[in-house]
Amino acid sequence: MVGRSNLSRRRFERLVRRALAALPEEFRSRLENVAVVIEDEPPEDMPDTLGLYEGIPLTERSLADVTLPDVITIFKGPIERTCHTEEDIEDEVRLTVLHEVGHFFGLEEAQLE
């Protein structure tokens, strides 16, 4: 089944929602103004990207900042292609959501590993 998941979009969305709901309340409450979206594929210049945070991390914001809403995008296609089973997909979705939420809170790549 590697790279050939038949996971429906609805099921994938549930996995993302479940990963977000599993976050501790003190983190979830800070994500109210963060849009979490699911796309089938990442941009062509980032074909293996599983997730993407776009915005200004909380640690870099000031009161004077006027920013667009932050966006976390989870890419269904690359996640499915890297996973062997539906359980693997569920685990990868959870890890990817945590990783991108970590960027929102200002964690760097090395801290997220």
Task: Describe the predicted segments one by one.
Residues 92-100:
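Short alpha-helical catalytic segment bearing the HExxH-like zincin motif
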Residues 1-92, 104, 110-113:
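Active-site rim/adjacent substrate-binding subdomains
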